[in-house]
């Protein structure tokens, strides 16, 4: 075997290893944060929470304390509203006439809203793994009331077999091997000695 054939064989082997390693599924995927939202029945439907970026509007605040404190920290005026007719509590830029408003943190209640907030999530429902309950942490800041926050644990994601990816990986590897084979044959044909008559 000549020097160029060895290099070509070595390059083909490295390319095949690279293709096989790239075709393997990514095992270290992170599961999204999942919280359970109670419905009118006893069935629990999990929803995916998106990570929050720095809030710029009042609608992005989901608690009374963060809504009222936005006036001081983000230089925007927000009101925490309790609407009895719609049975909703939320943060808004301006008060509504049929809702009572809260503009001080000492008036904020720790009771969560009774109606679940609808989301536009397309995530499949996942089951929470059996794990010990995390200990709640108490967050306290000057001039506010104590609120107990329970951290949500991330459920493990079950990996499933994806037939389309498997077939695509096989086609990719066979295609790369065919290209390598024809390149090898082409280079081998160039190495022959041609004799003139």
Curated annotation (Swiss-Prot):
* PTM section of the record: Highly N- and O-glycosylated; contains sialic acid.
Task: Kindly state the tissue distribution recorded for this protein.
Answer: Expressed at high levels in the submaxillary gland and kidney, at moderate levels in the brain, heart, lung, liver, intestine, testis, muscle and bone marrow, and at low levels in the pancreas, spleen and thymus. In the ear, expressed in the inner and outer hair cells of the organ of Corti, cells of Kolliker's organ, cells in the lateral cochlear wall behind the spiral prominence and cells of the stria vascularis.
Keyword ATP-binding: yes or no? no
Query: What cellular component GO annotations does this protein have?
Result: endosome; endosome membrane; lysosomal membrane; plasma membrane
Instruction: Give the start-end ranges of region Required for endosomal and lysosomal localization.
Output: 191-197
Spell out where the chain crosses the membrane. Answer: 163-183
Q: Which domain of life is it from?
A: Eukaryota
- Per UniProt, the ranges with Low complexity bias are 121-152
Key words of the record:
Cell adhesion, Cell membrane, Endosome, Glycoprotein, Lysosome, Membrane, Myogenesis, Signal, Transmembrane, Transmembrane helix
Record membrane topology: Single-pass type I membrane protein
Glycosylation sites recorded in the entry for this protein:
26, 33, 69, 75, 87, 98, 103, 120, 146
Q: Where is this chain's protein located in or outside the cell?
A: Lysosome membrane; Endosome membrane; Cell membrane
Positions in the Cytoplasmic compartment: 184-197
Residue ranges that the UniProt entry lists as topological domain Extracellular = 24-162
Record's signal peptide = 1-23
Q: List the disulfide bonds.
A: none
Q: Region annotation Disordered: residue ranges? A: 116-156
Subunit structure comment from the entry? Interacts with CXCR4.
The family this protein is said to belong to: Belongs to the CD164 family.
Q: What is this protein called in UniProt?
A: Sialomucin core protein 24
Q: What is the native source organism of this protein?
A: Mus musculus (Mouse)
């Amino acid at each position: 075997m000549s020097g160029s054939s060895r290099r070509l064989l070595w390059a083909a082997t490295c390319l095949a290893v690279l293709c096989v390693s790239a075709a393997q599924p990514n095992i270290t995927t992170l599961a999204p944060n999942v919280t359970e939202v109670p419905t009118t029945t006893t069935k629990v439907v999990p929803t995916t929470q998106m990570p929050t970026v720095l809030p710029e509007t009042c609608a992005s605040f989901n608690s009374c304390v963060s809504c009222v404190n936005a006036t001081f920290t983000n230089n925007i005026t927000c009101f925490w509203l309790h609407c009895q007719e719609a049975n909703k509590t939320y943060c808004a830029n301006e008060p509504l006439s049929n809702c009572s408003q809260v503009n001080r943190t000492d008036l904020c209640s720790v009771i969560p809203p009774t109606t679940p907030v609808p989301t536009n999530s397309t995530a499949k429902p996942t089951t929470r793994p059996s794990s010990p309950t995390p200990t709640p942490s108490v967050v306290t800041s000057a001039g506010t009331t104590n609120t107990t926050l329970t951290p949500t644990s991330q459920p493990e994601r079950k990996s499933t077999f994806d037939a389309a990816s498997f077939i695509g990986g096989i086609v990719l590897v066979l295609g790369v091997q065919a290209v390598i084979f024809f390149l090898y044959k082409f280079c081998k044909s160039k190495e022959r000695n041609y004799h003139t008559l």
